[in-house]
Amino acid sequence: MSYLEKPFRGIDFFIDTVQDLKSMKKEDRPPVLVYGDPDIDGLVSMREFLLFLEKELKDESIPYYVNNNRSHGFFIPSEKLRGYYVFCVDFSIEQDKMDELVANGVNIVSVDHHECQETFISSYEYEEEEIKGTITDSDGAFGFVINNQYPFEDPEWTFQSGMGVLYHCIGEYYRQVYDSTEYLDNKTTRALVGLTLLSDVRNIEMPEARQFLDALYTHPNEGYIGYLIESVLSKDYTFGLPCMDRNFVDYTFSPKVNSLFRFNRKDLACAFILGYGYPLEDYQTLQREFVEYLEGNITKKEYPNITFIEIPSTGLSEDEKSYVTNFVGLLASRYVTSSNVVIAYYSDDGVYGRASFRGSIQSIDFRRELNKLGLDGRGHASAYGILNFQPSEQLFESLNKRCTELFADVKEEVIFRDVPHLSLWIKTPSKGYRTSKENCYLLNHHRIYLRYTGDLSRIEKKRGNDRYSIYSVDGIEVKCFNNELTFENGLILPMLEKGRPVLQLARFIDE
């Protein structure tokens, strides 16, 4: 276990602001609001912020706010928040927006992890060192952004999620105010950081990230983590003690929560993360059915290293049109490969709406590079939204050319091991268990696969339908969710699930 040696810039302001509010009587204290982002990282960190402020300010009535339509940013009109202290987490506030808010008497404490400008984002009437006073009137409003992405911050911690940056802020608060590392050492808190690293697709291969994944994978699954797991389990969940492992997060937990946001059920998502249970309706199934319908109408324009997907409004009801743009990023993700990125965009009678970019290689800053060609991408390096996207042949050609150049510098090879007998391989701990466990700590495009080189006549299909197949190979179960894959053209992915190796025929050899 290791701590952040040098606190992020602005944490001292964070501590002083909370201490200032804490020193006031409740009836004299200015109104406080916690503003979260509409995704798993945003809600988990919003809950953590609420718990922290409720405890420190001895006030269990602090309100929160989350945007509709999975919109990322600060959208509450500033005139409605004059005199407020707004604690924001997991979304960007740029310098111009900060200046506007502060000029209108709104005090802002922002904790973020998205790419940002090179200089510290702050705005206040007084000199920097004077921000440490109790400033509650509109003339003395102030705002600042704590962010691990500033170039002056420790690069070893750039992987952190919004919850991760907040973890350091609150942990440093307790260390300085109470001389305690209990919060920093708390396994559930660290597990929540690990959960958001996975849900937000952060660079989990960075050395400092592993401790948070360890906390998640080895958590006893009690208390709040246990609640999250049990709430999203389906009735047909198979045997074995459920746990928040990589596959569970990727294929059960994240889809369950994200589907609520996509159908504009943010209130249900907030209620779930805040501890009030998951809704009875199966939104994950509704999501799959809606995506399949959308895929029946999309138009793809494919280039060597980039695919453009137009999602038309064809056949959609007015209600469906109100949330279809929330599915753009998901559709883009379904067509990404190790050598291909995707831009998906919505169109309604010639008017273009939300667009999203998705790529699988985090070592390339696609957002920065493609923004140089005229895009207005907002978000992370390889997963972000695009504002005011206007498709054209000229734009497509220029983006394809740049993506081809970017991929030319990437030496990504699929790592796989030839395995002649699955049963012997999986029962050898140094092979089966170790490889399956290590894959839980690797980015998708760095995972280790298996190529079956044994006797194909020993493979028996046990059951399946048009969506999946389950095979027995040397007496070992192998699942497959793409019926175009075979053991001749595909590779097997070993992962740990419920503490034991599981196998899935997961990708084409030449993909």
Task: Pin down the residues of each PLM region.
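Extended, charge-rich, solvent-exposed interface segments
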Residues: 509-511
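Structural detector for short beta-strands of small beta-barrel domains
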Residues: 442-467, 489-494
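Short, glycine-/small-residue-rich phosphate/pyrophosphate-handling segment
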Residues: 158-168
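Beta-strand/loop nucleic-acid-binding surfaces
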Residues: 471-487
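Hydrophobic helix-and-loop "lid/oligomerization" segment in the mid-to-C-terminal part
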Residues: 2-87, 100-106, 125-133, 140, ...
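Histidine/acidic-residue-rich, glycine-tolerant segments that coordinate divalent metal ions
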Residues: 92-160
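Flexible glycine-rich surface loops and low-complexity tracts that mediate binding to linear polymers
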Residues: 485-506
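Acidic, glycine-enriched active-site microenvironments
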Residues: 110, 162-164, 192
